[in-house]
Amino acid sequence: MTRCALLLLMVLMLGRVLVVPVTPIPTFQLRPQNSPQTTPRPAASESPSAAPTWPWAAQSHCSPTRHPGSRIVLSLDVPIGLLQILLEQARARAAREQATTNARILARVGHC
Protein backbone atom coordinates (compact mmCIF):
# COMPACT_ATOMS: atom_id res chain seq x y z
CA MET A 1 0.00 0.00 0.00
CA THR A 2 1.18 3.47 -0.66
CA ARG A 3 1.72 5.98 2.10
CA CYS A 4 -1.27 7.99 0.93
CA ALA A 5 -3.53 4.95 1.12
CA LEU A 6 -2.24 4.08 4.59
CA LEU A 7 -2.82 7.63 5.74
CA LEU A 8 -6.35 7.59 4.35
CA LEU A 9 -7.06 4.27 6.05
CA MET A 10 -5.76 5.59 9.37
CA VAL A 11 -7.94 8.70 9.07
CA LEU A 12 -10.94 6.52 8.27
CA MET A 13 -10.37 4.36 11.32
CA LEU A 14 -9.68 7.23 13.73
CA GLY A 15 -12.40 9.46 12.31
CA ARG A 16 -15.15 7.11 13.47
CA VAL A 17 -14.52 7.96 17.12
CA LEU A 18 -15.96 11.49 17.15
CA VAL A 19 -19.76 11.48 17.49
CA VAL A 20 -21.93 14.58 17.49
CA PRO A 21 -25.71 14.66 18.11
CA VAL A 22 -27.94 15.79 15.24
CA THR A 23 -29.78 18.47 17.18
CA PRO A 24 -27.73 21.20 18.80
CA ILE A 25 -27.86 21.29 22.57
CA PRO A 26 -28.85 24.72 23.89
CA THR A 27 -26.34 26.31 26.20
CA PHE A 28 -27.42 28.09 29.31
CA GLN A 29 -25.51 31.09 30.56
CA LEU A 30 -25.38 31.25 34.32
CA ARG A 31 -24.97 34.65 35.83
CA PRO A 32 -22.61 35.20 38.75
CA GLN A 33 -24.46 34.62 41.99
CA ASN A 34 -22.29 36.79 44.21
CA SER A 35 -23.25 39.96 42.33
CA PRO A 36 -26.12 41.77 44.13
CA GLN A 37 -27.53 43.21 40.88
CA THR A 38 -28.01 39.87 39.16
CA THR A 39 -29.16 37.75 42.09
CA PRO A 40 -32.90 38.19 42.58
CA ARG A 41 -34.05 37.73 46.13
CA PRO A 42 -37.60 36.65 46.94
CA ALA A 43 -39.67 39.15 48.89
CA ALA A 44 -40.76 38.24 52.41
CA SER A 45 -44.41 38.16 51.31
CA GLU A 46 -43.76 35.44 48.70
CA SER A 47 -44.45 31.87 49.66
CA PRO A 48 -41.53 29.41 49.64
CA SER A 49 -43.36 27.28 47.07
CA ALA A 50 -43.51 30.14 44.54
CA ALA A 51 -41.65 29.61 41.30
CA PRO A 52 -38.16 31.07 41.21
CA THR A 53 -37.68 34.25 39.17
CA TRP A 54 -34.24 33.45 37.78
CA PRO A 55 -34.09 33.58 33.98
CA TRP A 56 -32.65 30.08 33.70
CA ALA A 57 -35.09 28.49 36.17
CA ALA A 58 -37.87 28.21 33.61
CA GLN A 59 -35.53 26.48 31.18
CA SER A 60 -33.98 24.01 33.64
CA HIS A 61 -36.78 21.47 33.29
CA CYS A 62 -36.43 21.47 29.50
CA SER A 63 -33.39 19.27 29.19
CA PRO A 64 -32.69 18.11 25.64
CA THR A 65 -33.67 14.49 25.18
CA ARG A 66 -33.09 12.14 22.31
CA HIS A 67 -36.17 10.99 20.51
CA PRO A 68 -36.42 7.28 19.65
CA GLY A 69 -36.24 8.05 15.93
CA SER A 70 -33.35 10.50 16.17
CA ARG A 71 -30.10 9.54 14.59
CA ILE A 72 -26.55 10.24 15.70
CA VAL A 73 -24.45 11.57 12.86
CA LEU A 74 -20.69 11.53 12.69
CA SER A 75 -19.31 14.99 12.30
CA LEU A 76 -16.93 13.68 9.66
CA ASP A 77 -19.52 11.90 7.49
CA VAL A 78 -18.84 13.90 4.34
CA PRO A 79 -15.03 13.93 4.61
CA ILE A 80 -15.01 10.21 5.44
CA GLY A 81 -17.16 9.50 2.38
CA LEU A 82 -14.75 11.49 0.24
CA LEU A 83 -11.77 9.72 1.79
CA GLN A 84 -13.36 6.35 1.05
CA ILE A 85 -13.76 7.34 -2.60
CA LEU A 86 -10.14 8.52 -2.73
CA LEU A 87 -8.99 5.28 -1.08
CA GLU A 88 -10.88 3.21 -3.66
CA GLN A 89 -9.32 5.26 -6.46
CA ALA A 90 -5.84 4.81 -4.96
CA ARG A 91 -6.38 1.06 -4.71
CA ALA A 92 -7.58 0.90 -8.33
CA ARG A 93 -4.57 2.95 -9.49
CA ALA A 94 -2.19 0.70 -7.52
CA ALA A 95 -3.81 -2.39 -9.05
CA ARG A 96 -3.43 -0.92 -12.57
CA GLU A 97 0.23 -0.06 -11.91
CA GLN A 98 0.88 -3.58 -10.59
CA ALA A 99 -0.83 -5.09 -13.64
CA THR A 100 1.30 -2.92 -15.95
CA THR A 101 4.46 -3.97 -14.11
CA ASN A 102 3.46 -7.64 -14.30
CA ALA A 103 2.74 -7.32 -18.02
CA ARG A 104 6.20 -5.78 -18.64
CA ILE A 105 7.88 -8.55 -16.66
CA LEU A 106 5.96 -11.26 -18.54
CA ALA A 107 6.78 -9.59 -21.86
CA ARG A 108 10.52 -9.62 -21.05
CA VAL A 109 10.43 -13.21 -19.84
CA GLY A 110 8.56 -14.27 -22.98
CA HIS A 111 11.15 -12.71 -25.27
CA CYS A 112 14.17 -14.28 -23.61
UniProtKB/Swiss-Prot annotation:
Residues 27-66 are annotated as: Disordered. It comes from the Eukaryota. InterPro entries: CRF, Urocortin_II/III. Its main location: secreted. GO terms for biological process: adenylate cyclase-activating G protein-coupled receptor signaling pathway; cellular response to nutrient levels; digestion; hormone-mediated signaling pathway. It is found in: Secreted. Residues 23-70 form a propeptide. Residues 38-58 have a biased composition (Low complexity). Keywords: Glycoprotein, Hormone, Secreted, Signal. GO terms for cellular component: extracellular region; extracellular space. The keyword Secreted applies. Residues 1-22 form the signal peptide. GO terms for molecular function: corticotropin-releasing hormone receptor 2 binding; corticotropin-releasing hormone receptor binding; hormone activity; hormone binding. PANTHER family: UROCORTIN-2, UROCORTIN-2 AND 3. Binds with high affinity to CRF receptors 2-alpha and 2-beta. This is Urocortin-2. The lineage of its organism: Eukaryota, Metazoa, Chordata, Craniata, Vertebrata.
